[in-house]
Amino acid sequence: MPTIVSYKWTLINNLKISDNQLEELLFKLKSEVKPIDADHVEIEVNNDRPDLFFPYGIIRAAKGILGKELGEPKYDIKQSVYSFEVKEVKSRPYAVAGIVKDIKLDDESLRELIQFQEKLHITVGRKRKKVAIGIHDLDKITSTKIYYKPLPLDYKFIPLNQSKLMTIKEVIEQTPQGREYGNISIYDGLSPAIVEENGDVLSIPPIINSDKTRIDEKTRNIFIDVTGTSFEAVSSTLDILVTDLAEMGGKIELLNFISPSKFEFSPLLRRYTVSVSANYISKNLGINLSLNEIEKYLRMARFDTKVLNDVVEVTVPPYRVDILSQIDLVEEIAMTIGYDKLSPKDYTIKATGKLSAETELIRTLRDLSIGAGFSEIFTFILSNDKRLRNEYVSIVNPVTVEYNAVRNSLIPTLLNFLKYNQHAIMPVYVFEIGDVVIKDKRTDTGYKNSLRAVYGIMNSKVNYEDLQSRVHQILMSLDIEPTYKTYLDDMFIPGRGAKIIDTSKSVEIGVIGEINPVLLEELEIEFPVVISEIYLDSLVKR
């Protein structure tokens, strides 16, 4: 979980509490605190609460638990004279911007603000791949019109902490930030950029800001840009930033927002409602709460509420990105009450667990297979589509072409295993039990998992009977009497392949045969191979 370092006295003085009370409060916020020195503490915060990555976000939440402030905070929001226009940027198409005025920064709060930015980069931003943030001194921006657009790599500006003009290409090649993040956003020789109307660069996200708009302790008015690959992510990140800064006493200003989106102003500061009944809360918490009590606890968690009949309608603030459904509100109530105040209850239903029929079959089959002289292997369920036949599930945007499909049979992965183990001492006896994914129109997705077993023998001399005798004995040990029916398939040598039939049910339960030399040559396997695949789904039901 993310950890932040905070100036202890910011928290204690704003909340008017002791060190011990601070520890108790943070525990109620699912956070842990430990001292670093006389003035600083390290706080471990949950990933799902990015609004707590900044001390003033913690102060806002803690004031609710203490009962000092209830409901959603009301911020001073005005319309700005500034505009922010988003042009087409193919590599990172989404951008939003906001302004916060009249903040007071000192050495500690400046460090905490930069830390806040970096924690958001690492978590929500996925190391700037999904979201990147630029924080600027608004008073150093000379134009009221600001643009997000692509720039050529020979465009020049002075990057942060540099003293000379550099091209974007030089920044990427010569600065630590450029070497780390430069490959994220460059597309077709162009880089995303935040630019003033006069052409001055404010930043080239996700790499670096311009030195022109560097923030320091004298900064009082801030311009924030947030860019990335997800509109939802960039807009919610900006909401978190401006509302946390507003807790310092800052005043939020909305920019005129010109973009392909339907929104006219930025930040969006969107709210939504979640309705929850008293019965649902009581059932999940195990205690009976009245509607008035539910309202009280939710307002302590800094939500605005409205009671409609037996339901509480909860307005979720823009910065609470962790609230997705009713159960999240139940957790908020539990945290506000305090988990130490909730008594555990014994289960009223007692039952004895046992292995499933599928697990029993797998264990028995594994023992029988090892007893028959086979060694077990484990291969990936993902495979290369060139190895598969018939219909299979393809992977969208695979990490590597080697794993761009889901196997629909265990045979291709076993053959691939044998290909890379031809150096082993012969003969090679191997088996695998695992899932494949096959077509099934009766399911919602059109596909289903199917449990199978595969057996293979590779040797300088091997034939159908060498494997058939072993597979036959294994099936007989499972109380299955198999019969064999000729099976013609390109995979097998003609006349040397068969379907395996469960005699009692007249159901096909597998195939067996000698692999065609043509296929072996394609796979670069130099030894004869005989293989059998057993369909275990029908056997589980016995």
Curated annotation (Swiss-Prot):
Gene3D superfamilies: 3.30.56.10, Bira Bifunctional Protein, Domain 2, Phenylalanyl-trna Synthetase, Chain B, domain 3. InterPro entries: aa-tRNA-synth_II/BPL/LPL, B3/B4_tRNA-bd, DNA-bd_dom_put_sf, Phe-tRNA-ligase_IIc_bsu, Phe-tRNA-synth_IIc_bsu_arc_euk, Phe-tRNA_synthase-like_B3/B4, Phe_tRNA_ligase_beta2_arc, PheRS_beta_core. GO terms for cellular component: phenylalanine-tRNA ligase complex. Its cofactor is Mg(2+). SMART domains: B3_4 (SM00873), B5 (SM00874). It catalyses: tRNA(Phe) + L-phenylalanine + ATP = L-phenylalanyl-tRNA(Phe) + AMP + diphosphate + H(+). Keywords: Aminoacyl-tRNA synthetase, ATP-binding, Cytoplasm, Ligase, Magnesium, Metal-binding, Nucleotide-binding, Protein biosynthesis. Residues 269-344 form the B5 domain. SUPFAM superfamilies: Class II aaRS and biotin synthetases, Putative DNA-binding domain. Its main location: cytoplasm. GO terms for molecular function: ATP binding; magnesium ion binding; phenylalanine-tRNA ligase activity; RNA binding. It is found in: Cytoplasm. Mg(2+) binds at residues 322, 328, 331-332. Belongs to the phenylalanyl-tRNA synthetase beta subunit family. Type 2 subfamily. Tetramer of two alpha and two beta subunits. This is Phenylalanine--tRNA ligase beta subunit. It comes from Sulfolobus acidocaldarius (strain ATCC 33909 / DSM 639 / JCM 8929 / NBRC 15157 / NCIMB 11770).
